[in-house]
């Protein structure tokens, strides 16, 4: 029996050939499933025609975070190879990272470009806190990003099951990516072309906020009671203009789950900057966002639970089943859905 508060209820079976490992071109030729809540109907279209389905009186919000080449390979000074994934910066030029390979507190890690790191702490979940240096000089975030963009790799999601390629540098960034800090792209926005963005800007105006997507976005919910899940936190900022437009907005379309969580966190706390750890689910529904544009998400993830916060568990599973039957492509490089 389905229970919206049980993780096992959010499971579904997806054929492997429907996991998108590369995007379609052009980007707006991706399929778009539109679910209209007032008529309880599903329409199949493409992103190119999205304006046909959007209400007139609408404020659109997007995430302008930029993905870092956050995956780097190196060695321990004592020998032995390691792989490091930068998750996010902390205070005082310290960084939360994930490391593949055994490393203890005090271990020194060596990388190209004379980059090194020293492990300062080990978190309960196995993450490490490190400091980065170049030629023994401690690095601030922007200096680190500059080096990572020379030696690092884009951290493609594990379900793509492939290494990053040159074309991903363009494909896995949004057209409006501006503020470095994410280790995953806000994927609903990968479907836009310059022309489509221009048309949306002319009709509605576009608003940008920032949430730096962290590695926690891929963390599975591994407890059966979803309300016991420890939600990850991610840094966000809402600028003055975006805040003004959000406050006076009549109807809000959030492009992606990251935008949804940012706006809903602001609606609950009135904070325009900080760490967002909001977990939206059927027991914690949206209060500010009216419409959602998003991709199709992993089973048992907080992201599919967020979708269910808009339309309920049963309707979410029904739509996903329809998308599978209609051969939609799933996950980061896949097709999308619009809830109106």
UniProtKB/Swiss-Prot annotation:
Biological process annotations from GO: queuosine biosynthetic process; tRNA wobble guanine modification
One example GO MF annotation: S-adenosylmethionine:tRNA ribosyltransferase-isomerase activity
Entry EC no(s): 2.4.99.17
Signal peptide positions on this chain: none
Gene3D superfamilies associated with the record: QueA-like (3.40.1780.10)
GO (cellular component) term, any one: cytoplasm
Pathway: tRNA modification; tRNA-queuosine biosynthesis
Keyword vocabulary terms for this entry: Cytoplasm, Queuosine biosynthesis, S-adenosyl-L-methionine, Transferase
Main location: cytoplasm
Class of the enzyme per the UniProt entry, highest EC level: transferase
Highest taxon listed in the record's lineage: Bacteria
Keyword Cytoplasm: yes
InterPro entries associated with the record: QueA, QueA_dom1, QueA_dom2, QueA_sf
Record field: catalytic activity: 7-aminomethyl-7-carbaguanosine(34) in tRNA + S-adenosyl-L-methionine = epoxyqueuosine(34) in tRNA + adenine + L-methionine + 2 H(+)
Pfam families named among the record's database cross-references: Queuosine_synth (PF02547)
Localisation per UniProt entry: Cytoplasm
UniProt similarity note: Belongs to the QueA family.
Protein's job: Transfers and isomerizes the ribose moiety from AdoMet to the 7-aminomethyl group of 7-deazaguanine (preQ1-tRNA) to give epoxyqueuosine (oQ-tRNA).
Subunit and partners: Monomer.
Name listed for the protein in its UniProt record: S-adenosylmethionine:tRNA ribosyltransferase-isomerase
């Amino acid at each position: 029996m389905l229970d919206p508060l049980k993780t096992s209820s959010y499971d579904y079976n997806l054929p492997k050939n429907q996991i998108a490992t590369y995007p379609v071109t052009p980007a707006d030729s991706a399929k778009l499933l539109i679910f209209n809540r007032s008529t309880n109907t599903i329409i199949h279209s493409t992103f190119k025609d999205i304006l046909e389905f959007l209400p007139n009186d609408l404020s659109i919000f997007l995430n302008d975070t930029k993905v870092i080449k956050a995956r780097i390979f190196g060695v321990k000074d004592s020998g032995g190879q390691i792989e490091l994934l930068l998750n996010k910066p902390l205070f005082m030029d310290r960084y939360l990272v994930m490391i593949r390979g055994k490393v203890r507190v005090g271990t020194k890690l060596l990388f190209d470009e004379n980059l090194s790191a020293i492990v300062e702490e080990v978190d309960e979940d196995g993450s490490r806190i490190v400091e980065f240096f170049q030629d023994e000089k401690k690095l601030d975030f922007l200096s680190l990003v500059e080096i990572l963009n020379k030696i690092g790799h884009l951290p493609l999601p594990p379900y793509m099951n492939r290494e990053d390629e040159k074309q991903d540098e363009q494909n896995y960034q949004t057209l409006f990516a501006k503020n470095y800090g994410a280790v995953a792209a806000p994927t609903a926005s990968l479907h836009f072309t310059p022309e489509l963005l221009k048309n949306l800007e002319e009709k509605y105006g576009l608003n940008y906020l920032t949430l730096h997507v962290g590695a926690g976005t891929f963390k599975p919910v591994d407890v059966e009671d979803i309300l016991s899940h420890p939600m990850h936190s991610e840094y966000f900022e809402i600028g003055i203009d975006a805040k003004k437009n959000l406050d006076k907005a009549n109807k809000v379309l959030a492009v992606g789950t990251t935008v949804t969580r940012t706006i809903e966190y602001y609606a609950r706390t009135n904070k325009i900057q900080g760490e967002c750890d909001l977990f939206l689910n059927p027991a914690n529904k949206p209060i500010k966002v009216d419409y959602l544009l998003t991709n199709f998400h992993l089973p048992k993830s907080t992201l599919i639970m967020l979708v269910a916060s808009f339309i309920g568990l049963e309707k979410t599973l029904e739509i996903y089943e329809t998308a599978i039957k209609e051969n939609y492509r799933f996950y980061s490089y896949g097709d999308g859905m619009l809830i109106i």
